[in-house]
Amino acid sequence: RAIAVQGFRKIAIINGHGGNTAPIDVALIDINQELGFPVYNVPYTAGVDESPFLDKQNYMIHSGEVETSLILAYDESLVDPSYTNLSGNSGGCSDYEDCGALSTFHYMESHTENGIMGESCAASKEKGIALADAYCKRLVEVLSDERLWSVPV
């Protein structure tokens, strides 16, 4: 409400965690109804296919190649240098989960002992820069589409 009261009519929540998607989507039902215009839940990845940027993974998973590359691009000092020797399991128990055909959720400990659910060893600052650039360009493209902002609620 506070943002809308200031006159903003183009509002997007840039979501940085997959676990937040469902609760944000549920909240947007009431928010959109109350405000009378659409507010969007947009993952910062904005639908970018990460696979062309990656060597050992096809998509983002916790502390894997994508996330570690992004943090390296932001500030290398935040990443423990031992990441080059670490990897974890993919997080999915089946190909169906890995490709997104279905999902379920568990405590992190049931998937990984070290918090890594991907191939952090394949991360690089260069990949992180390229991914961040692709995400930003896609966010601009998506959010600049005027059709989004005229959808009735």
Describe the predicted segments one by one.
Residues 1-12, 18-153:
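Extended, histidine- and acidic-residue-enriched regions that form the cofactor-binding/catalytic faces
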